[in-house]
Amino acid sequence: MGLLETNQYLHSQLEKSKQDFRDLTEKLLTSQATVYSLAKQLQKYKCEEYKDLIESVLEEEAPFEEGNLAEKRRLATGLGRYDSLIEAQARELTCLRQKIQEGEGVCHLFTQHAKNTIKTFESFIKTTDMTYYQRQRFCELLAQGSQMAERLASKLSTENHHDRKDEEGQESLAARLSMGLQGEEVNEVLEDSLDEKYLTHSSHHDSHRPPSSIASVCDVQDQL
């Protein structure tokens, strides 16, 4: 039997014991009221045989008059009803607390998984043929999923300052990944631009330079 099952079992036993105690208290009040009424009746008949017993009963407080007895029984019944409500709410709060703890653990696991996925994706996208915008979109979706999980964990957790630190770290990771993509894209653009300029310059230079055969003919003519 786990800790939760043991706790629920003990709560049920405690509630049962309290209910039994309330039932016995009500029966005791009824019995005391009955004894008090009988003592009053015997006093009227001046029964000498039970005089000492009657006096001992009547010397006690007289909370068992008809009005007082009804009030006490009403209070006992009301207290019993409120005790039942309190016990039910306590059990419900225990279950909710356990669900919150389980949800918090799941959120932390998902957040860690998202961080690991982003790190793996960061190294993977550098070897693919995806465009810059496709890579950036994937990074944004991964970062958004991780941040939503962290916000949910922050709402469920009582240590919100730790979750805020994790969220800041996640945002910096997403920003670093985005900046890395931008830097890679800029390098690609610069390389393409340099290659294009080099090819253009080479073709332009070659167009103004005569072919080797023509240059040789010109040299022979000059010698003649």
Swiss-Prot record:
Region (Disordered): 198-224
UniProt biased composition (Basic and acidic residues): 198-209
Region forming the signal peptide: none
Entries under InterPro entries matching the protein: NBPF (IPR055306), Olduvai_dom (IPR010630)
All copies of domain Olduvai, residue ranges: 159-224
Superkingdom of origin: Eukaryota
Similarity comment: Belongs to the NBPF family.
Descriptive protein name: NBPF family member NBPF6-like protein
